[in-house]
């Protein structure tokens, strides 16, 4: 920071000297005096510069100290902000924990209240059940005395529960026998109803079977007639097929004879197979066409001969 200020003062001194040189040039001052004046001006300027430098150093030190104080305050403020932020975060965390604990306590209190209500209801039900059992016990006291008397009369049983178990077994057996009896009676009634239905439906069934037998007999007779008709048609078809086969054989023999005659007329040996009837017919057809063309040519040549 000192170099720019020194440059500034040096430039200011040069400007000041440059402004005074013309004025001094006008005056006729001896060179020695001018040199002394210049030295004095330089000394004054240097003193002024040193004074300004001292002031500048003082201000710079003060500013530096001020900056350090400001930086220290800034660091302190940042630390305060950090501590305050941490304090706020801790406070918020404590508040959230307190809210969660309060909510959990309310929830637990609600659950405890519900559990207490359930237990109280269960207690009331148990009390009612106890009262009902007490009333039943009072009603069953005569039965208990009666069972004890019966146990004295029955030496085969040592305890009342044995007698009660035996009685329960007999009661269950009796109930099972009664159920089985009802089921058998129901089956018997169903069998009787089915037998009566069969007896009632027997005449109708016999009549229906007779009608069905007559229908089947009619269908059998019709089938026999159709069989005879088809047999006669089959014989007729066989006869017709035999006639067609005989006619086909004769036709094939005639075609073979014609083919052989044509080959003999042409002086050529037969080259086609005996079973190739179509080829033989085609050969005879070509021969007949050639012969017809030849005869037609002869018919046209005979009238032309007398004219010549």
From Swiss-Prot:
Main location: cytoplasm
Subcellular compartments: Cytoplasm, Cytoskeleton, Cilium axoneme
Name of one Pfam family that matches: DUF4200
A biological-process GO annotation: cilium movement
Positions in coiled-coil regions: 34-143, 175-233
InterPro entries, per database record: CFAP_domain-containing (IPR051147), DUF4200 (IPR025252)
Bridged cysteine pairs (disulfide): none
A cellular component term, taken from the record's GO annotations: axonemal doublet microtubule
Keyword flag Metal-binding: no
Source organism superkingdom: Eukaryota
Alphabetically ordered keywords of this record: Cell projection, Cilium, Coiled coil, Cytoplasm, Cytoskeleton
One Gene Ontology MF term: dynein complex binding
Function: May play a role in ciliary/flagellar motility by regulating the assembly and the activity of axonemal inner dynein arm.
Family affiliation: Belongs to the CFAP73 family.
Protein's UniProt name: Cilia- and flagella-associated protein 73
Gene that produces this protein: CFAP73
């Amino acid at each position: 920071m000192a170099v720019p200020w020194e440059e500034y003062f040096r430039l200011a001194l040069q400007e000041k000297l440059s402004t005074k040189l013309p004025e001094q040039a006008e005056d006729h001052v001896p060179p020695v005096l001018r040199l002394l004046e210049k030295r004095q001006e330089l000394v004054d300027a240097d003193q002024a510069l040193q004074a300004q430098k001292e002031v500048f150093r003082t201000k710079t030190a003060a500013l530096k100290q001020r900056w350090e104080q400001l930086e220290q305050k800034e660091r302190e403020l940042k630390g305060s902000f950090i501590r305050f932020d941490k304090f706020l975060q801790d406070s918020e965390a404590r508040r959230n924990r307190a809210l969660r604990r309060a909510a959990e306590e309310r929830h637990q209190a609600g659950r405890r209240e519900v559990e207490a209500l359930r237990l109280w209801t269960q207690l009331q039900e148990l009390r009612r059940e106890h009262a009902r059992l007490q009333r039943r016990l009072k009603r069953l006291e005569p039965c208990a005395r009666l069972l004890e008397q019966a146990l004295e009369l029955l030496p085969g049983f040592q305890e009342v529960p044995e007698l009660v178990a035996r009685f329960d077994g007999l009661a269950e057996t009796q109930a099972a026998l009664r159920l089985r009896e009802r089921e058998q009676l129901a089956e018997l009634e169903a069998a009787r109803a089915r037998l009566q239905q069969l007896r009632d439906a027997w005449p109708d069934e016999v009549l229906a079977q007779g009608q069905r037998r007559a229908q089947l007999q009619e269908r059998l007779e019709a089938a026999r007639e159709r069989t005879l008709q088809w047999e006669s048609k089959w014989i007729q078809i066989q006869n017709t097929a035999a006639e067609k086969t005989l006619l086909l054989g004769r036709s094939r023999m005639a075609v073979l004879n014609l083919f052989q005659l044509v080959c003999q007329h042409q002086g050529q040996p037969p080259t086609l197979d005996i079973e190739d009837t179509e080829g033989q017919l085609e050969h005879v057809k070509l021969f007949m066409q050639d012969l017809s063309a030849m005869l037609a040519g002869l018919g046209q040549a005979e009238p032309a001969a007398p004219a010549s």
